[in-house]
């Protein structure tokens, strides 16, 4: 990347991640002054010129979600008023993604509202990472890139479990498309958990569709919130005599008692390994060998180079999957 024409900034939730990205790119991270006034208002100032530059700004809109989102909106406004040539907002985690439709009367579609806010603030392009539902792309009236991370995870998980006797498992019907993409890319069998959700953050797994007995099962999901879905799925897989059960999720929110639930699942042998990415800073598991964080810095490095060189992002996935097939 040409540091004279491109500049990379990070807001509060992605600083460690972007530091590694810039280190790989051998370019400095842009400097930002970020303060909070006594009444809680956010102040942001960019400490270098962005005039006529292509700007890439990273932020995960994770907890506290509203503060993280407002920080991003203010930063985009500052870049726009600073005459940036283009502003690409890269969101490793996109908050409010689950509020993407109305299920009852008088409900909002907050994911669409957030898309409108980002567009109005002045962003030129948005990159979303393993979004909860593909329809989110249609909420924007600007270019949107939906980045996939499965190939980054598979390098580690397949290396650990091996392809023999490996089954990809979707913890519910909503995740079938995601799980099938992974299973198809490596020519692996697919299993599905039949689940119902009687209330918010409450999940019940009922049955397994597919052969999992004496198999190494890899449960695939986009995010883990309270952990109820994947732990219930793991328990059901064990009841169906699965040999190993590992969980792979891009976004680890781990709200409420999720860390304690997973620690109990590790201790009871329900879950062998839990893999999440650093799309959200991970601080809730200390020195736990079963909990592994997959670094997304190499992926974002490649994505930024694609932006800088006007090349195809989809080629990244093809190249990595071919490498996994040959070497893992």
From Swiss-Prot:
Gene3D superfamilies: 3.40.50.2020. Its main location: cytoplasm. Its EC number is 2.7.6.1. It comes from the Bacteria. GO terms for cellular component: cytoplasm; ribose phosphate diphosphokinase complex. Pfam families: Pribosyltran (PF00156), Pribosyltran_N (PF13793). Its cofactor is Mg(2+). Homohexamer. Disulfide bonds: none annotated. Binds 2 Mg(2+) ions per subunit. It catalyses: D-ribose 5-phosphate + ATP = 5-phospho-alpha-D-ribose 1-diphosphate + AMP + H(+). It is an enzyme of class 2 (transferase). Keywords: ATP-binding, Cytoplasm, Kinase, Magnesium, Metal-binding, Nucleotide biosynthesis, Nucleotide-binding, Transferase. This is Ribose-phosphate pyrophosphokinase. PROSITE patterns: PRPP_SYNTHASE (PS00114). GO terms for biological process: 5-phosphoribose 1-diphosphate biosynthetic process; purine nucleotide biosynthetic process; ribonucleoside monophosphate biosynthetic process. Belongs to the ribose-phosphate pyrophosphokinase family. Class I subfamily. SUPFAM superfamilies: PRTase-like. InterPro entries: PRib_PP_synth_CS, Pribosyltran_N, PRibTrfase_dom, PRTase-like, Rib-P_diPkinase, Rib-P_diPkinase_bac. Mg(2+) 2 binds at residue 172. It is found in: Cytoplasm. One of its GO terms (molecular function) is ribose phosphate diphosphokinase activity. Signal peptide: none annotated. ATP binds at residues 39-41, 98-99. HAMAP family: RibP_PPkinase_B.
